[in-house]
From Swiss-Prot:
The protein's Enzyme Commission number: 2.3.1.97
Name recorded for this polypeptide: Glycylpeptide N-tetradecanoyltransferase 1
Family, similarity comment: Belongs to the NMT family.
Chain intervals for the UniProt region annotation (Disordered): 1-24
Organism: Arabidopsis thaliana (Mouse-ear cress)
């Protein structure tokens, strides 16, 4: 279970097309190619010794169709699960983080704000808000014991954090209870202390105590072994600011005024019946989502309680819109995005990059292009600088036409203690982890 994705990278515009800053040949991003490059670049001494001891797909097993799909290790009796926490180095101690407490929430927020994932050039760092963290960490049926901190014994300062939340994820035809592992963060000055492996083992132990034996997680780095590798795409909403802060660059033969004109959007959504989601829409949205997600090889298994928590709009956290037929009043289409700003490091004029991230979208009557263009319009109205999307589900069908450009960030998806016989294409994945 692992560190989350890095902030999406930069995008370069060229003439009236959008091209990536670090071009990748599409055929070169297959899982086998990525793994081969990884293995070629790693000496034997640097291989992932920790992950080789864990029940995860191993690089050496890729292509071995004799291995069964499903759990790698069987569930063990709860009485045999280690009852005491794993030992930390003597100067540290475990703490359980109560996200209902304002003080505790502030501690977690500040740790992440100052030490969480940065882009490769150290220009941007994720800045999850306190409201976002409470939303992400307190879904229906959450376990406070899965919100795990590490303190320095002497100063009592929070120096590391890892979290899990319960989820139901369908893998092929089987719905599996899992933990979604996220927000693994160790203070920058303690990165050499090998805290992460023991934190991963501890959250795994606590998950096992609730009789859950599988997990899902993402990382911006390659570990053994991704079930799929997704590409980040970015759509400029405020191109001047994005260029000024170094997120994107002015393309060859492009002026700033031409670039602004290229990305200009209408002032209001154009789809009749397009409106903000309300509590009364939860049953209809749940039906739409369940039907849509059923076509993907791995997907989240939403019920109404999940939809109410994850998709009802929350200011500066998550936005959801739908199309209600003016004639029948049926809910026919749905789009959503969550708010994840990044701190801009070392820029004298700007401190925050406001980014929207595509979440779950379903189009049945409205064209997907028109639905997502309306999502871009409302995100621009709400002051976002950029709209980000992964090439999961059917997202690839709108990315190029709506002027998204591929970034240099990739996100690898993993399952813990569950083997897939073959890797998925991004378009076969119906799961978005925050």
């Amino acid at each position: 279970m692992a560190d989350n994705n890095s902030p999406p990278g930069s995008v370069e515009q060229k003439a009236d097309q959008i091209v990536e800053a670090n071009p990748l040949v599409k055929d070169d991003t297959s899982l086998e190619t990525i793994v081969r490059r990884f293995q070629d670049s790693m000496s034997e001494a640097k291989t992932h010794k920790f992950w080789e001891t864990q029940p995860v797909g191993q690089f050496k097993d890729i292509g071995d169709t004799s291995l069964p799909e499903g759990p790698i290790e069987p569930a063990t009796p709860l009485s045999e699960v280690k009852q005491e926490p794993y030992n930390l180095p003597s100067v540290y101690e475990w703490t359980t983080c109560d996200m209902n407490s304002d003080d505790m929430c502030s501690e977690v927020y500040n740790l992440l704000k100052n030490n969480y994932v940065e882009d490769d050039e150290n220009m941007f760092r994720f800045n999850y808000s306190k409201e976002f963290l409470r939303w992400a960490l307190r879904p229906p049926g959450y376990y406070q014991s899965w919100h795990i901190g590490v303190r320095a014994k002497t100063s009592k300062k929070l120096v590391a954090f890892i979290s899990g939340v319960p989820a139901r994820i369908r893998v092929r035809d089987e719905v599996v209870k899992m933990a979604e592992i996220n927000f693994l963060c160790v203070h920058k000055k303690l990165r050499s202390k090998r805290l992460a492996p023991v934190m991963i083992k501890e959250v795994t132990r606590r998950v096992h105590l609730e009789n859950i034996w599988q997990a899902a997680y993402t990382a911006g780095v390659i570990l053994p072994t991704p079930i799929t590798t997704c590409q980040y795409w970015h759509r400029s909403l405020n191109p001047k600011k994005l260029i000024d802060v170094g997120f994107s660059r002015l393309g060859a033969r492009m002026t700033m005024s031409r670039t602004i004109k290229l990305y200009k959007l209408p002032d209001a959504p154009i789809t009749p019946g397009f409106r903000k989601m309300e509590p009364r829409d939860v049953p209809a949205v749940t039906r739409l989502l369940r039907n849509y997600l059923s076509q993907f090889g791995v997907a989240t298994d939403f019920d109404e309680n999940d939809v109410e928590h994850w998709l009802l709009p929350r200011e500066d956290v998550v936005d959801s819109y739908l199309v209600e037929s003016p004639e029948t009043h049926d809910v026919t289409d749905f789009c959503s995005f969550y708010t994840l700003p990044s701190t801009i490091l070392g820029n004298p004029n700007y401190t925050t990059l406001k980014a929207a991230y595509s979440y779950y979208n379903v189009a049945t009557q409205t064209s997907f292009l028109q639905l997502m263009n309306d999502a871009l319009i409302v995100s621009k109205q709400k002051g976002f600088d950029v709209f980000n999307a992964l090439d999961v589900m059917h997202n690839e069908s709108f990315l190029k036409e709506l002027k998204f450009g591929p970034g240099d960030g990739q996100l690898h998806y993993y399952l813990y203690n569950y083997r897939l016989k073959s890797a998925l294409k991004p378009a076969e994945l119906g799961l978005v982890l925050l």
